[in-house]
């Protein structure tokens, strides 16, 4: 599908928000991703918009150092007026609202998947608790802070916890420090949240996702309750 690039803007110092206008309405589930089709490769990106925005797709694209794929995408964004895409893709998505509390754990731009899920559930008046943990390296990487804090301030059931992994983030940072999966588990146990009742979505690299899975299973989460695209894209032997 060929889409017109509606706009490109910076969300922070290095992450771009790309809006694509589709030639016809599209259908997908919150949490799915697409591929940007280039001449010599296909590059996956989670969809940040919701299924309710059926003719406008939002992507968040951040450059990755020493990556040919990333360099190719950045070059296209600097010059192109359209993108060819393939969608919908992925097995980690929200087909129906869960019947209990929801835990979302994201690393870096993995937050795009969680943004789509969160905003979709808002539209559906989801009544159970949503716990969103977002792990980044530095405070300035929390480029959707205002959005999620606004949701938290206007929703009784939404909890947003950003986590910085940089060991000494400086005096301006008063929030959580560490690895996002570990911080999430520690805080949930401290708050006496029953892990076996949670539906969990995790977005990040394979090492982060599987480490989070192992920690939560050790503390009583059924394996079937955790969902991540990494389980199918990079299955563990």
For each predicted feature, which ranges?
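Ferredoxin-reductase
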Residues: 1-81, 137-138, 164-166
């Amino acid at each position: 599908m060929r889409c017109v690039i509606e706009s490109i803007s910076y969300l922070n110092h290095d992450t771009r928000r790309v809006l694509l206008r589709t030639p016809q309405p599209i259908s997908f589930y919150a949490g799915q991703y697409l591929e940007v089709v280039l001449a010599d490769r296909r590059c996956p990106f989670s969809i940040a918009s919701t299924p309710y925005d059926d003719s406008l797709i939002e992507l968040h694209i951040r450059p990755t150092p020493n990556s040919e794929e990333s360099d190719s995408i950045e070059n296209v964004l600097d010059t192109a007026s359209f993108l060819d895409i393939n969608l919908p893709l992925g097995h980690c998505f929200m087909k129906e609202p869960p019947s209990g509390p929801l835990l979302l754990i994201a690393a870096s731009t993995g937050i795009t998947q969680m943004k789509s899920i969160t905003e979709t559930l808002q539209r559906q008046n989801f009544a159970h608790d949503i716990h969103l943990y977002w792990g980044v390296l530095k405070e300035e990487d929390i480029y959707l802070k205002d959005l999620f804090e606004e949701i938290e301030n206007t929703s009784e059931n939404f909890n947003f916890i950003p986590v910085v992994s940089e060991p000494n983030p400086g005096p301006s940072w008063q929030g959580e420090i560490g690895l996002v999966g570990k911080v999430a588990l520690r805080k949930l146990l401290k708050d006496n949240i029953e892990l076996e009742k949670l539906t969990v979505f995790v977005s990040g690299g394979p090492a982060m996702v599987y480490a989070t899975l192992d920690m939560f299973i050790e503390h009583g989460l059924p394996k079937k309750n955790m969902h991540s695209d990494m389980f199918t894209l990079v299955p563990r032997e």
